[in-house]
């Protein structure tokens, strides 16, 4: 994991993000904090050109409209042609027909190296389930110690079915390519009270992927550990009278200051 982080800092990859309007600034700042460079371009007239300049692509369906849907398809196909690493964040899949249809359509036309979402979003894509609570996972879908084996089986099965690395994030994170799985226990409950920590993680994963294309599974796991560890560190640095807004900044600060050694020491994971 140390090497994955150090590669991001050394290579400083340019990551193209077609993301949502709610969290776009935080996504850009997290990518900068880890040592990569973000660009946010979503007009159909330039997305293919911008994608050509970058090493990675992060597609997030959080705030959809017909213009950005077209841009996502164009950018995704261009990135595939260039053999760039691509991540799909199917925000709110299962919450509306448009979101589910858009995510499935993208998956049909574009090969994604990583799909990152909560359990409810992934179930919506895999099973047609509609248990998503807005953009959050339904309580019934949370990965817990008591259902961990069942969820690991589900994650591995659909990573193989989708032909991708699947990152299911929540209280316990699962990262798998269908064969090998990382069970990650970094992070804290307070992170769920801040808008966009999932979107930030998708940006972070995209940066790690772009810098570690030959070691994709470990790169995704390392980014996931880094985000959770930053949440833990940020929480520990909060002072009396500081709340959500400060905590968001503390997380970004922790990412910007994180060393490879700190990540290696603080990462909490097991391989199944």
What does each of the following model-derived ranges do?
Residues 30, 34-83, 88:
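Active-site cofactor/substrate anionic-group-binding motifs, chiefly glycine-
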Residues 195, 205-247:
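Conserved post-catalytic alpha-helical subdomain immediately downstream of the catalytic base
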């Amino acid at each position: 994991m140390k090497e994955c982080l150090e590669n991001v800092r050394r290579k400083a990859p340019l990551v193209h993000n077609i993301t949502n309007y709610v969290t776009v600034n935080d996504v850009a700042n997290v990518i900068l904090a880890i040592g990569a460079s973000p660009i946010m371009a979503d007009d159909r007239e330039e997305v293919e050109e911008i994608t050509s300049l970058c090493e990675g692509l992060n597609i997030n369906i959080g705030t959809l409209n017909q213009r950005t849907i077209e841009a996502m398809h164009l950018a995704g196909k261009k990135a595939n042609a260039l053999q760039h690493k691509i991540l799909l964040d199917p925000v709110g899949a299962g919450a509306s027909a448009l979101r589910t249809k858009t995510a499935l359509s993208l998956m049909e036309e574009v090969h994604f190296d990583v799909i990152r979402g909560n359990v409810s979003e992934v179930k919506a894509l895999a099973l047609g389930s509609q248990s998503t609570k807005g953009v959050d996972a339904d309580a019934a879908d949370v990965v817990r110690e008591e259902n961990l084996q069942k969820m690991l089986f589900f994650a591995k099965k659909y990573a193989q079915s989708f032909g991708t690395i699947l990152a299911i994030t929540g209280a316990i994170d699962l990262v798998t390519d269908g064969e090998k799985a990382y069970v990650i226990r970094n992070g804290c409950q307070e992170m769920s009270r801040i808008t966009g920590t999932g979107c930030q993680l998708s940006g972070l994963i995209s940066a790690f992927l772009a810098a570690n294309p030959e070691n994709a599974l470990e790169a995704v796991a390392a980014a996931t550990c880094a985000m959770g560890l930053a949440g833990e560190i940020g929480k520990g640095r909060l002072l009396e009278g500081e709340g959500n807004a400060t905590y968001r900044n503390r997380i970004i600060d922790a990412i910007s200051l994180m060393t490879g050694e700190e990540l290696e020491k603080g990462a909490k994971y097991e391989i199944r």
